[in-house]
């Protein structure tokens, strides 16, 4: 159910963004050499964060806008793959991805991030198309650095409370 999609991964820090990109890139290279994983070959893997030099960042932004474009009638092209980004993608980019995987930052940031997934379409698929990593017993990247610890903890607590009392809202 998650094949052939455009996936957006949003990380709280550039370091986490680069780490995930590098790990996935290595995994894709390994899978490309294995004939049982041919589908991986026609998927794109890209990264965008705020530490690129200006010219490179402009090119990356053009590329993600092209990749995440949906026509007014809700039609998307046949491209598929993964964009791994820092929080730069949560605002000001008019993109529409199929699947969102994100670290929790705070509720405001989470709503912005969710707005990059099925932006101009209605979700009609099975399962979930937004996945939020809350850090478990550890903190997500950036907490205590660019994300206030108190706001993060409150956001995490309230989200867990909400979904605990409203499990049907998960769809």
Question: What positions do the PLM features span?
Answer:
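C-terminal helicase lobe and adjacent C-terminal extensions/tails of nucleic-acid helicase motors
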Residues: 4, 15, 19-76, 97, ...
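Conserved two-lobed SF2 helicase motor
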Residues: 72-90
């Amino acid at each position: 159910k998650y094949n052939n999609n455009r996936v957006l991964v949003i990380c709280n820090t550039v370091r986490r963004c680069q780490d995930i990109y590098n790990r996935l890139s290595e995994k894709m290279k390994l899978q490309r050499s294995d004939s049982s994983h041919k589908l991986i070959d026609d998927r794109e893997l890209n990264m965008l964060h705020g530490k690129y030099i200006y010219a490179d960042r402009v090119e990356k932004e053009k590329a993600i806008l092209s990749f995440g474009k949906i026509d007014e009638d809700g039609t998307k092209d046949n491209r598929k793959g993964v964009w791994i980004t820092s929080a730069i993608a949560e605002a000001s980019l008019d993109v529409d991805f199929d699947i969102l995987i994100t670290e929790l930052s705070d509720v405001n940031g989470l709503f912005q991030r969710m707005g990059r997934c099925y932006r101009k379409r209605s979700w009609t698929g099975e399962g979930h198309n937004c996945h939020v990593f809350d850090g478990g017993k550890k903190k997500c990247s950036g907490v205590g650095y660019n994300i206030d610890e108190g706001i993060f903890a409150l956001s995490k607590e309230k989200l867990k409370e909400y979904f605990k009392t409203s499990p049907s809202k998960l769809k």
